[in-house]
Every structure is written in C-alpha cells, then in structure tokens.
C-alpha cells in the first residue's frame, strides 16, 4: 500500500496510519462470531477509556457520521415533556439546537461569541429561572474555532440543579483525558474518525446505564433509537441492529490498539498539545495570529486570523495541497479565519514542513 497522497491537517477525517488503512483491505460478515466479539471488545475498550467506574456505563455504536449519534441521543433521551438547555458558541452547538427544533423538543439557548467559552454565570442564571429544563447539552471542543468549553463546570451545575447532562465530545474524546463518572456526564458522544484516529463510518455514545434504561420507548426515530440499538448489541453479543460498517469497525479496533501502544490518552494529548503549541509559535513567526485566547485553546484545531485584506485563502489552500497538505477554511461569520488541525497521525516534523510550505507562499509585513 502506498503512503498518503497528502497530509490531512483537519479535525476529522484525519490522517490515519498505514496499518489502520491496511485492515480495510479484507471483507467481513456482519453475522460472523469473531466480528461480533470484536464489536464487544470495542465497546468495552471505549468504556475503559471513558471512566474507571466501568460497571456504571455502557457503549452504543451507531452507523453514520457523528451527527447521527448526536441526533440519536437528542431524539431518544429527552421525553416528550422534556426541555433542553443548549450551550452554544459555534456551528456544532447550533446544530444541536436545530435538531431539537426539528424534533419538536422544547429548547432554550445560552449563547456566547464563537471565540469565547460557555458563560457559566449565564448558564446558572438560566437554570435558576427556568425550572422546566430537564437536560443540558454542551460541546466540549467546538471545532468551529478550536475553543474548549468548561464541561467540568457545566456538568457540575447541571447536577446541582438535577439535570441530565449531554456532552458532545466529538473532537476531544481519545485526545483529552475525560472521566465521565467524575465529571457526572450522563451521555457522551464521539466518532470513529477523530482523536482515536479511525476512519469515518460510525459514531458512539457512552452512557450511564441507569439513564439509558429510562429511554425505552422514547425515540422519535426507528433507525436512531438509542435504547433499541443498545438492547440489540447487548442481547445479541455485539450484533448491530442494522447493517454495520464492518471495514470501519476493523479499522477502529486497530486504531484503539495503536492508541494503547502510544501510551493511552495522556500520551496522545501530549503529542497533540505539542503539535498545537509548535504550530502557533511557528505561525506567529511568519505573521499569523490565532483567534482563540491561549487559555481557551484546544490541542485539536487552531483558527488563524487572515493577516491582511489581500490574503487569499484559496490560493494558499491550493499551494499547500500541491505541497502535500490539506487544511480547513474558517467557519465563523464575524472574523475571516482559516483552520489547521493538529490531530491524526501528525508529528512535530510534519508541523515544521507545513509552516515552511506556508512561509514560501505568504510574505507578511
């Protein structure tokens, strides 16, 4: 198998290892006992990554993009008379609001600017004033900008006021240490193609068992019924309720083994964090400033402000692609930015090569 044709410096899909790609060269049967045993191992490994209190939590795997898993949670967990508070400061928080509205779920929003973290004071004020709220949702790493939201404080407040807590950890789980029991998270959602460094094809939900059991019969969708998905996997020893992405599951299992070999989530966080800090330092040297304040910046993806009015992102994108790199355009409305991801099979030497390539095509100041 040939090496990558270019390096993805994006927040997922991302650059995977050759060994992760190689396991997808074979075909697998969804009914095969060995395959279903692998599914069960994946589920168990995810819980062990999420908490030391493994007996209290379970994993549900869900076909589709991470958004499918988020919508499965929103549509299955919140009862008809429920009401959700959503903390938003980017596109993915707004998407949760949109899901709730489409599903006719009563929703209230705590919104901050895209470069500012969730406002805990405002969240508490809303919880104090609106006694009808039953659930609270927050995005951990909002990849619209790369900002980290204070999930410790949000979940603590949620439990202080007796709410069910939902955390979209799509772009952080596996790359930032999280103990969902300590943080009092009831439902955590992530995806195969993010920090665990698998490929796109399924998402997953790590849920507190007691809370999941309350969801039976509540789903607003047949194929996105979180409880029924879990019940099928649980009762049929790893069998998915509908056709599973077998190649993607094998790639994900391999990626989990490689995460363990790297030294676990802490070691991976250190690599990502080093990538991010090196990237910012090198980009500052050639005239680019990050959007997000350092104290709120994640190690996942970094937004850089356009340096001058004449700056042409499309030209930079095409030049970088010719040099073997792919980066992301900006996603916020008030400031012109572009984004560079720090995750995947990306290392210090790659960051140096990238910035050297940017410096060739851009002269600032």
UniProtKB/Swiss-Prot annotation:
GO MF annotation list: 2-aminoethylphosphonate-pyruvate transaminase activity
GO biological process terms, semicolon-separated: organic phosphonate catabolic process
Cofactor(s) required for function per UniProt: pyridoxal 5'-phosphate
One Pfam entry name: Aminotran_5
Residues found modified as N6-(pyridoxal phosphate)lysine: 194
Highest taxon listed in the record's lineage: Bacteria
Main EC class the enzyme belongs to: transferase
Enzyme Commission number(s): 2.6.1.37
Keyword annotations from UniProtKB, A to Z: Aminotransferase, Pyridoxal phosphate, Pyruvate, Transferase
Catalytic reaction(s) noted: (2-aminoethyl)phosphonate + pyruvate = phosphonoacetaldehyde + L-alanine
Biological role stated in the UniProt entry: Involved in phosphonate degradation.
NCBIfam families registered for this protein in UniProt: PhnW-AepZ, PRK13479.1, transamin_PhnW
Assembly with partners or alone: Homodimer.
Similarity-based family: Belongs to the class-V pyridoxal-phosphate-dependent aminotransferase family. PhnW subfamily.
Protein's name in the database: 2-aminoethylphosphonate--pyruvate transaminase
Protein encoded by which gene: phnW
